[in-house]
Structure formats: C-alpha cells, structure tokens
C-alpha cells in the first residue's frame, strides 16, 4: 500500500494531476463509530496501518482526494457474520456509483463514502440468506477486531 501509492503520487505531482486514493474505514480502531473525516486515525491491523501510512503521504499533496470507504463484491463472501460488529460498508454495485460521483466532483482532501450503519450480519442477510450469526469474542485474529467502523455519511 505504501510503495505503490508513493509511485503513483510521485507521478501525479510531476504531472500536476489530481491524485485519488481509495482508503478504508479500518484506519479507525472501531471504539467509537460514526467516524468523521477529521477524526484521528488509530489503525489496529497491519493492513490498516499500511493504509494509514499511505494516507498520510497522499495528504502532503494538495491536489488529492482520499476516499475512505469499504465494500464487498456482489455477494457476502463468508458463511458467518458478526452480530456485534457495526459497519457502513455495502456491496460494490451500491458503493461504486457513490465513489465515482465523489471522484468526479471537485472535492479535495478526505471524504467518506458510506452506506447506512448496520451490523455485519444484517448486511450479510441482504444478499445471502444462509449466513450463521456469530460474535467477535468467538474469534482470535491476533488483534482486537473493531466493533464499530461506521463512517458518518457525507
């Protein structure tokens, strides 16, 4: 996430073109929910830390747009989903038009592209009816899973 982003950023700066960086809701630790663009980042996973580092680099270029978002493909990819993890992610066919609209705007800085806040389990049931509910406490990923990564809609 960092090296590739640096290479693209360098090209954008040299060419004088706008840099659009797709980031993630995971730059937050999930302790609060309804995160706003100016809330302090506090990543917990290795992936989130790399996205945070790349974001900090992109912020140095004034002609840039950082879009924080999160989405699944067209279906929910797992057999189980957390009932106690909150999100504002959605499916790609819902999020893509919102993302493209933001990219095509004149907006610069940091922007959140999100959907309604709901549990991961509720989101899963929209496209997959045979999902088993589960709890965060039942799994060990080597770090504390974020409980609420919902983003405030803009």
Model-predicted regions and their roles:
Residues 1-20:
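NAD(P)-cofactor binding segment of oxidoreductase domains
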Residues 98, 102-147:
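Mid/C-terminal beta-alpha module of Rossmann-like enzyme folds, strongest
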Residues 5-9, 52-59, 97:
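Conserved active-site helix of classical SDR/Rossmann-fold NAD(P)-dependent CH-OH oxidoreductases
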Residues 36-52, 85-93, 118:
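Short-chain dehydrogenase/reductase
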Residues 19-25, 67-69:
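SDR active-site strand-loop-helix element
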Residues 63, 69-76, 86-115:
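Alpha-helical substrate-binding/gating segment
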Residues 3, 25-44:
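Active-site "gating" loop of Rossmann-like NAD(P)-dependent oxidoreductase/epimerase domains
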Residues 14, 42-70:
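Active-site Tyr-X1-5-Lys
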């Amino acid at each position: 996430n960092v090296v590739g982003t640096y290479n693209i950023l360098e090209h954008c700066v040299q060419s004088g073109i706008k840099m659009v960086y797709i980031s993630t809701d995971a730059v937050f630790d999930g302790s609060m929910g309804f995160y706003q663009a100016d809330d302090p980042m506090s990543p917990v996973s290795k992936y989130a830390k790399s996205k945070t580092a790349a974001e900090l680099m992109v912020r140095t270029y004034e002609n840039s747009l950082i879009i924080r978002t999160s989405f699944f493909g067209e279906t929910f990819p797992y057999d189980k989903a957390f009932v106690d993890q909150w999100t504002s992610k959605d499916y790609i066919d819902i999020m893509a038009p919102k993302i493209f609209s933001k990219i095509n705007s004149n907006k610069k800085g940091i922007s959140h592209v999100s959907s309604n806040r709901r549990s991961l389990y509720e989101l899963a049931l929209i496209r997959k009816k045979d999902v088993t509910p589960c709890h965060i406490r039942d799994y060990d990923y080597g770090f504390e899973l974020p409980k609420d990564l919902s983003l405030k809609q803009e």
